[in-house]
Amino acid sequence: MIMNPTAIKHVVVDGHSLTLESFVAIARYNATVELAPSALEAMKKSRALAEKIAAEGRVAYGITTGFGEFQKVAVPKEMSNQLSTNLILSHCTAAGEPYADEIVRGMMLLRANALCGGVSGVRPILVEMLLEMLNKGVTPVVPQKGSLGSSGDLTPLAHMTLPMLGKGEAMYEGVKMPGAEAMAKAGIKTLDTLVSKEGLGMTNGTCAMTSVGALALYDTICAAQLGDVIASMSFEGLTGLRNAFDPRIHQVRGQKGQMLVAANMRKLLDGSEILDNCQKDRVQDAYALRCIPQLHGACRDALDYVREKVEIELNAVTDNPLMFLDDEAVISGGNFHGEPMALPFDFLGIAASELADASERRTERMVNPALSNGLTAFLTTQAGVNSGFMIVQYAAASMVSENKIYAHPASVDSIPSSANQEDIVSMGTTAARKAKMILQNTQDVLADELMTACQAIDIRRRLNTHGQGMTPLHEALYQHVREKVAFYEIDREIWPDIRAVEAMIRSGELLDIVKEYIPDFE
């Protein structure tokens, strides 16, 4: 079950209690944040240990040494502040279009939450500043390309940190401006410098990939729920056979997602006059209809797995080295490595791609007179002079094929960096970015199917070969679409209608209607 993040208005950031919904509430819907007192105290103690280590001149990576291949180079304690600041300045090398504000806000939140763990040795002011920027709407400009996903998301996080130093660029009140100007307009005092360990503390972590991937995950969960609904409308338009959703079939297999989707289909199709009165002239349907629980259910199981991993990472400490107060140990490790996220985000993209595959096949069945159980060719009333929905299916097929390219796993790739000190990397940020691109295509493919299903229902009613009545929910969704997209009597400019339905898919308004009729819908 996924709750509505817009209901969450305020979140206490403590390092261990973020959920997917509270993350989305802050990153996308601007829920306010505050620092938990317990996290503040933990960071103060951790910072005291970092200062003690620096003062004693103990060998500690990134505090008294250089970075990467320069780990063997000793840095005098009087240069430790410059070391941290230089790390930010030298690492902001990203390229490409900037991330959307919601993704950067997610990065800021995740960095703050990780530092709240109290083992990174940074001053609390860094977290306080990040949370103040979130509350006041200062969003650093962060280009999308340049992260290998190990050592974490160094490049994007360096760009994220620049405005805190009065550098770089930021968005404020919808306008891009120099970072110093944005901070001044918001009334946030910038830092003159970072101090020892803080360069690593701000950049060593998986915050960019996790922000991109977590938002894509939330949207894919919503798309999967809506995928069941749209599939059921197509099923009704194609007069499918409901016996494929008999619970006994699914219980004997025992796959959780499959059983959930089968239950959804039974709820969604209950009370359909069209299906109650259709001719039973076949024993079973094609896979795209009969196997909706198996196809969509497998995607649901994949999303459950990805959610489990993401919610761990939302509250993870992904810095290096880490400091433990009980024995004053400073331990170098690899929590920054993105592999634990790279594989799930590849899986996320594959699951979203499969949803689109199934959707496009249902669209094809509705427009193909050989497969549609009596619908007109391409759902037009004047064949030949009108092409109807012929090219709607083309567009869906194009996006499905594009998804197959994007679905190739990023995590199987690696490339050495930093003179082979960082010799195997995760490409987790690439995996997350690909998953988002696949999701966007999938949302558009579902929009094509929904438009086609509404046209198919109208054609079915005109032919009057079965009862006229859809289920009450389907009727409500149909009417909602028809408020903006009229029946296609003759060909007309179609792209504005496609954009309108795509907007319905992305806004969440269709799921709101579903939950009015089926409150426990999952």
Residue positions per predicted region:
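Alpha-helix capping at helix-to-loop junctions
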Residues: 112-116, 132-140, 148, 166, ...
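Cysteine-centered functional microenvironments
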Residues: 142-147, 326, 330
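A broadly conserved amphipathic alpha-helix scaffold signal in soluble, globular proteins
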Residues: 128-135, 155-158, 162, 225
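Polyanion/phosphate-binding surface patch
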Residues: 56-58, 73, 261
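C-terminal auxiliary extensions adjacent to catalytic cores
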Residues: 2-31, 35-42, 46-49, 54, ...
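Conserved, non-catalytic sequence blocks in retroelement Pol enzymes and Pol-derived host proteins
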Residues: 119, 148-150, 384
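Glycine-rich, flexible loop motifs
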Residues: 4-21, 25-57, 84-143
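FAD-binding core of FAD-dependent oxidoreductases
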Residues: 61-75, 79-83, 90-115, 143-165, ...
